């Protein structure tokens, strides 16, 4: 319990450093670019994109508190820059919840492929499949059970692919030594 409390306190303290804010701003810019040029919408219910990678890097570097706030602000900014439909706070909540989950799994831990797969599976099942489908049902009235199978299949197909992409990119960046500037050595 004490370890969890310290993780949240340390992550919250990350918000007070200029370097954290600067890195978050750079990651936000990268996410906005990826959202504009590297996203594919397949109908109104399925979107494939890579703008979540900078979010996960922020969660990895700065933890669940900073990552959660970063994701919430970035989701709203993304909406204003490139709206894909009506604004709905449920999707912002989902971005924040996903960041919180990733932050809990990644922050101050050694990043392994198994850890990434597990974190991504939790996010896929809770956030992407259940909550996003619920919000789409509330917004468009298409029926939760009608769109659930399509969204489940898409997310389960993308789960290992997204996990591999994030893990590979993060490991490559880690090998350059850039992350060591912002992050203490991993514990476990």
Annotate each predicted stretch with a short phrase.
Residues 1-188:
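Loop-helix junctions at membrane interfaces
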């Amino acid at each position: 319990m004490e370890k969890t409390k310290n993780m949240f306190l340390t992550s919250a303290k990350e918000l007070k450093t200029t370097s954290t804010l600067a890195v978050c701003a750079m990651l936000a810019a990268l996410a906005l670019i990826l959202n504009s040029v590297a996203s594919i919408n397949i109908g109104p219910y399925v979107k494939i994109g890579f703008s979540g990678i900078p979010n996960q890097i922020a969660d990895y570097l700065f933890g669940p508190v900073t990552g959660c706030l970063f994701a919430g602000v970035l989701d709203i900014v993304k909406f204003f820059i490139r709206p894909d439909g009506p604004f709905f706070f449920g999707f912002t909540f989902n971005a924040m919840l996903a960041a919180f989950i990733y932050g809990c799994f990644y922050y101050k831990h050694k990043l392994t492929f198994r850890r990434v797969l597990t974190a991504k599976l939790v996010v896929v099942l809770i956030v992407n499949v259940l909550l996003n489908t619920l919000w789409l049902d509330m917004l468009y009235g298409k029926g939760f059970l009608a769109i659930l199978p399509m969204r489940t299949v898409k997310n389960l197909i993308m789960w290992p692919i997204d996990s591999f992409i994030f893990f590979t990119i993060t490991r490559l960046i880690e090998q350059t030594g850039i992350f060591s500037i912002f992050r203490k050595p991993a514990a476990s």
